[in-house]
UniProtKB/Swiss-Prot annotation:
Biological classification of the source: Eukaryota, Fungi, Dikarya, Ascomycota, Pezizomycotina
Cofactor: Zn(2+)
Membrane topology annotation: Peripheral membrane protein
Pathway in which this enzyme or protein is active: Cofactor biosynthesis; ubiquinone biosynthesis
Pfam families, A to Z: Coq4
Protein name per Swiss-Prot or TrEMBL: Ubiquinone biosynthesis protein coq4, mitochondrial
Note: This protein may be expected to contain an N-terminal transit peptide but none has been predicted.
Encoding gene per record: coq4
Keywords: Lyase, Membrane, Metal-binding, Mitochondrion, Mitochondrion inner membrane, Ubiquinone biosynthesis, Zinc
Length: 282
């Protein structure tokens, strides 16, 4: 039987990632092609998924992201596919239980180079939250504009919660000082898992298996204990209105949130590199 898709349905299908289209094609023999019966989106950019599609997206994106952890789109898809039905609602409820969290849900602020003046942040005192954020972005060579838009979470409010978590991720890097090297990302994901309970952050810790032996030892002896201890005892970071904290002292904010700054990973890696270089020279 041949299928004739309207241009609108072709557009819907084109928005689906390759892994999800594979899942759709596998199920075509047992039921009608799901794109033909896709529900109406709940918000701009929303792609509704069936349970089979969501499971396929979760498994496919998790496996592919393990082998290529720099594919932010795969990590984002895995995060959305595994956040429902429970975990993203728990995070939303944590915001609803906090006066600041409720304000964030009401105001719906977004974090990007359009909403934050990077030029102004670079003029703040060196210990200000905004200056630490801008300096971290400059040092790591990243931009606040690289976060994908949420599209696989059905509830519109929960979709914003996931978007907010995603856009705040670099602030977590900035206040902890962890770099975006794989070792630093694994440490931060462990911290986020203890603080948010989002499954994707926990799954990301499997990337520790891809680290070098010395890096794995550092993770298990230094950064995993720090991440789990601080993630559990710290306040819910999803409730931090970062836009209102930019001129505060980063040390003061860390103390208020209950976060101890970890050992400087870049300095540890630099010292290790220098030690190896000295050994080769002798």
């Amino acid at each position: 039987m041949s299928l004739s898709l309207s241009p609108g349905l072709y557009t819907q299908a084109a928005r689906l990632p390759r892994e999800l289209l594979t899942v759709c094609s596998i199920t075509i023999a047992t039921r009608s092609f799901s794109v033909l019966h896709r529900p109406t989106p709940n918000y701009p950019g929303h792609v509704p998924l069936t349970s089979i599609e969501r499971s396929g997206l979760a498994v496919g994106s998790a496996i592919m992201a393990f082998f290529n952890p720099y594919r932010a789109d795969l990590i984002a898809a895995c995060g959305e596919a595994t956040a429902t039905p429970y975990f993203i609602y728990r995070l939303r409820d944590a915001m609803l239980s906090s006066p600041t969290g409720r304000r964030i849900l009401r105001d719906r602020p977004r974090i990007s180079s359009k909403t934050l003046s990077m030029q102004h942040l670079r003029t703040l005192p060196t210990n200000a939250v905004g200056r630490c954020y801008a300096d971290w972005l400059d040092r790591e060579g990243v931009s606040p504009d690289t976060r994908d838009s949420v599209k696989y979470i059905d509830d519109e409010e929960c979709a914003y919660v996931m978007q907010r978590y995603r856009e705040c991720h670099d602030f977590y890097h900035a206040i902890t000082g962890l770099p975006i090297v794989r070792e630093g990302e694994v440490a931060l994901k462990a911290f986020e898992f203890a603080n948010t309970l989002l499954p994707m952050t926990g799954l990301s810790m499997f990337a520790v298996m891809s680290l070098k032996p010395a890096e794995r030892r550092r993770f298990f002896t230094i950064y995993a204990p720090w991440a789990l201890t601080n993630g559990l005892k710290a306040d819910e970071l999803i409730n931090v209105y970062w836009e209102e904290q930019l001129e505060r002292s980063v040390e003061e904010l860390r103390e208020e949130l209950g976060i101890e700054k970890p050992l400087d990973l870049r300095e540890i890696r630099r010292a290790e590199k220098e030690r190896k270089k000295a050994q080769k020279a002798t």
